[in-house]
């Protein structure tokens, strides 16, 4: 070979190469993705330059990438008939770590040309990923438009230097041969290579072909070599929505999600302007088995100009939308040099915000257009969506529109009522959205806190899932109306009761000494004792003050193993109930104490579902019943 010389890399050489090869990439098979991406770039460069210089094609305009293996020599070769490189370009692009010929090419192009390009290899470490699986890499290349004797040979063992020489190469383009390390024979296997290409390069517009040998049927005959196209899947998301059928969208969803059922809905959009990207987002019909596994990553597939970069790119979707499947394809995304971890930047955040709004709009449309499908969605993913009000304050109102509830108006635990439905049915003079949280639907439905609301025909949301209390601590209002827990102390609730008549006033006045006796007996165990007119069938209830931690929130703390502050209840008494009147007539202090304790335990049991000493409660009840 003529002009042979050995040169040192123009960077931090051996140390940097070693760091990159062994640490930069988390998945060694992506070397093939990187090399095919580089080949795709080379084809794009030739296509652009041939627009003004068609003779660069030299009669070979069918651009492609070819992959072949040699099991005897233990080599894997990736070749293309793209733009190729001159000697200076080889030194410049392959002799410098983190130097990208693609990036330089982009900078030399006009903005309109950049917009239409499909260049993907914008980071100069991609080529060197070959050393993850190879202990020696050789490159044979010839620039388009150059003579056959102007080919270039490059070789390196990834040890800090490389050899370069002049060669004769009959055709343009680049041929990269990897001499595989011991233990990397899997990349000599035809099926393994095919699967990697299908996984990472399925949607490159450039054909990716693999060598296929057919044995001769004649004895002693030579086998024939042909090239089989591997990347059969189309870049569906680059096509116009009007050109894609529902069946194609459904099949593509199954392809990228490995799901067997059709999605409930999808949204396909191309955005142009300051940021340009295409998104294709799907709402699955059922929850994945690992949706609640916090260690499992959830997110969109990330493509850069149709080349797969990573699964589960979490940066583009908030956690409460982790059920969304799909992809985003852009050339403007900020990536670190390995393309493995997206940089935390304004561009990424803007994309996240836009995609989040897109999903919320898609769900809103699904709810309006197909209530049955939306109910399927809610049954599968409602619990996840309920994380939204706490996680995403900027979209809280939009998320609230998507929530569904069981209510006192329906005799079913099915969560089918929207907040818009609730507001449309509010009675005259009602200015709050009332709700109750409990351990179960049955407990919520039968709570004594609902007695006044049933009497007045006021609908109450029945919340019975563990996340509900936490969600409601962030969901403070909807459509200008505040939320009010019916288990919290609220002066306006008594105003909902009938105006006190003279008889009620007299009854309350007569029982005022009773209230004082109860206060004296219970002391610091309760925050206050007072009458209420929101009860009809129940003698007493306990409520928490407006600024006090609720019973359900205290249970959440306890379930999480955290120490919650002790809840001090307000003990509210129904002055018109027979048991209250009977207790008030008891003069014996010991018996009076038993009555008060029984009434308090009943109220606590209704509120909390448990008592500190249920056996004492039973003995006390039996004693009073047998008296």
UniProtKB/Swiss-Prot annotation:
So which domain of life are we looking at? Bacteria
Q: Which InterPro entries match?
A: HATPase_C_sf (IPR036890), Heat_shock_protein_90_CS (IPR019805), HSP90_C (IPR037196), Hsp90_fam (IPR001404), Hsp90_N (IPR020575), Ribosomal_Su5_D2-typ_SF (IPR020568)
Task: Please name the gene that encodes this protein.
Answer: htpG
Q: What molecular function does GO assign, one term?
A: ATP binding
Residue ranges of the region described as C:
556-627
Q: Show the HAMAP family listed in the entry.
A: HSP90 (MF_00505)
Primary location recorded for the protein, binned into one broad class: cytoplasm
Give the protein's recorded name. Answer: Chaperone protein HtpG
What does it do?
Molecular chaperone. Has ATPase activity.
Q: How does it assemble?
A: Homodimer.
- How is this protein annotated for GO cellular component? cytoplasm
Could you list this entry's UniProt keywords, alphabetically sorted.
Answer: ATP-binding, Chaperone, Cytoplasm, Nucleotide-binding, Stress response
Outline the segment boundaries, as ranges, of region: A: 1-339
> Which Pfam family, any one of them, does this sequence belong to?
HSP90
Cellular location of this protein? Cytoplasm
- The annotated region (B) lies at 340-555
Record-stated family: Belongs to the heat shock protein 90 family.
Family annotation (NCBIfam families): PRK05218.1
């Amino acid at each position: 070979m003529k002009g042979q010389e050995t040169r040192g890399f123009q960077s931090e050489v051996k140390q940097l190469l070693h760091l990159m090869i062994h640490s930069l990439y988390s998945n060694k098979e992506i070397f093939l993705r990187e090399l095919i991406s580089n080949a795709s770039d080379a084809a794009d460069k030739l296509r652009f330059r041939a627009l003004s210089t068609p003779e660069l094609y030299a009669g070979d305009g069918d651009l492609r990438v070819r992959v072949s293996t040699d099991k005897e020599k233990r080599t894997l070769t990736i070749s293309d008939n793209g733009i190729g490189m001159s000697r200076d370009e080889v030194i410049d692009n392959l002799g410098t770590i983190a130097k990208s010929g693609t990036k330089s090419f982009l900078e030399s192009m006009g903005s309109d040309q950049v917009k239409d390009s499909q260049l993907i290899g914008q980071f100069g470490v991609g080529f060197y990923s070959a050393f993850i699986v190879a202990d020696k890499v050789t490159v044979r290349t010839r620039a388009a438009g150059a003579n056959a004797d102007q080919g270039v040979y490059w070789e390196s063992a990834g040890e800090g230097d490389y050899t370069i020489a002049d060669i004769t190469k009959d055709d343009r383009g680049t041929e990269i041969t990897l001499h595989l390390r011991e233990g990397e024979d899997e990349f000599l296997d035809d099926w393994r290579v095919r699967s990697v290409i299908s996984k990472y390069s399925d949607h490159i517009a450039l054909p990716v072909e693999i060598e296929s040998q057919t044995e001769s049927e004649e004895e002693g005959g030579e086998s024939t070599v042909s090239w089989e196209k591997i990347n059969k899947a189309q870049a569906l998301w680059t096509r116009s929505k009007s050109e894609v059928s529902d069946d194609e969208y459904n099949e593509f969803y199954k392809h990228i999600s490995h799901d067997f059922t059709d999605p409930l809905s999808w949204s396909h959009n191309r955005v142009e302007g300051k940021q340009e990207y295409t998104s294709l987002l799907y709402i699955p019909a059922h929850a994945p088995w690992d949706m609640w596994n916090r260690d499992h990553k959830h997110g969109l597939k990330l493509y850069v100009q149709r080349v797969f970069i990573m699964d589960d790119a979490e940066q583009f979707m908030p956690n409460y939308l982790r059920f969304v499947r799909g992809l985003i394809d852009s050339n403007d995304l900020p990536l670190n040099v390995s393309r493995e971890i997206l940089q935390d930047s304004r561009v990424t955040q803007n994309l996240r915000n836009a995609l989040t709004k897109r999903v919320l709009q898609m769900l809103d449309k699904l709810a309006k257009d197909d209530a049955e499908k939306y109910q399927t969605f809610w049954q599968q993913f409602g619990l996840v969506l309920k994380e939204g009000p706490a996680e995403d304050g900027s979209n809280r109102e939009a998320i609230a529109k998507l929530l569904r509830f069981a209510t006192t108006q329906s005799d079913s635990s099915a969560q089918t009522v929207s907040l818009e439905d609730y507001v449309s049915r509010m009675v005259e003079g009602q200015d709050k959205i009332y709700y109750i949280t409990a351990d179960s639907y049955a407990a919520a439905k039968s709570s004594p806190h609902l007695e006044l609301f049933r009497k007045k025909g006021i609908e109450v949301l029945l919340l019975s899932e563990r996340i509900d209390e936490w969600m409601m601590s962030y969901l403070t209002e909807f459509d200008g109306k505040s939320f009010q827990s019916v288990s919290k102390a609220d002066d306006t609730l008594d105003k909902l009761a009938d105006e006190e008549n003279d008889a009620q006033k007299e009854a309350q006045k007569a029982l005022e000494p009773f209230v004082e006796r109860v206060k004296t007996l219970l002391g610091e165990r309760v925050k206050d004792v007072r009458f209420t007119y929101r009860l009809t069938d129940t003698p007493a209830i306990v409520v928490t003050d407006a600024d006090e931690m609720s019973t359900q929130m205290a249970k959440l703390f306890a379930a999480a193993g955290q120490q919650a502050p002790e809840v001090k209840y307000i003990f509210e008494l129904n002055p018109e109930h027979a048991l209250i009147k009977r207790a008030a007539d008891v003069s014996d202090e010991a018996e009076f104490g038993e009555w008060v304790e029984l009434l308090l335990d009943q109220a606590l049991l209704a509120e909390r579902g448990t008592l500190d000493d249920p056996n004492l409660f039973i003995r006390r009840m039996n004693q009073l019943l047998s008296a």
